[in-house]
């Protein structure tokens, strides 16, 4: 038996095939992006069209209020930080470490020295995937970085939240007021509908847009933040390979080349 088993082709083929697969995954990821976004827009346009026909002169603001208050994935990273901050305040010695001005690495080292700190770090690590795959910017550019590879960012937010909690402030996002205004607006307009047929049309369009409207923001987290963070990291692995072989100076230098040029470099 020969190990590793011969494949009949060079390992360089796997390398180029893997890069091509990454490119195709980006195309596929953005197909999902527009699938989510365009379906949301379609549902909103249909609901807006029904509303304008039933309520001539209705404002765009009123239509917007009737679909507001969707719970979206983009809120989740902030919620995880809030939960971690409350947990820190409830643990002995944890809040004091998190409020210090030292970098994240120093705080982690200090937390690992105490039992409650270790327990808090376990909760932090559990929250990281997928919710800390959040870009430090728009998510569109490789140089923006992400929470997952720059822990000073989430630790900085947690420091602020802990301080606010100790001052008696509320740190969680509240949709209660928005949801109340939404439900009241829908109820008021629904009272104006005279026929069962029109009411059925309104309810159908409204239920549809309320069901899928969250995707207007969900695509933002899952594609432009989570997916892009992973994709950029995979491209950097190719950059590291090129550095090791003397082709470029730094892993991020690979981003200077387009998707047609990189296979040529890999071939070399």
Language model region names:
Residues 1-268:
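Contiguous hydrophobic, helix-prone segments at protein termini
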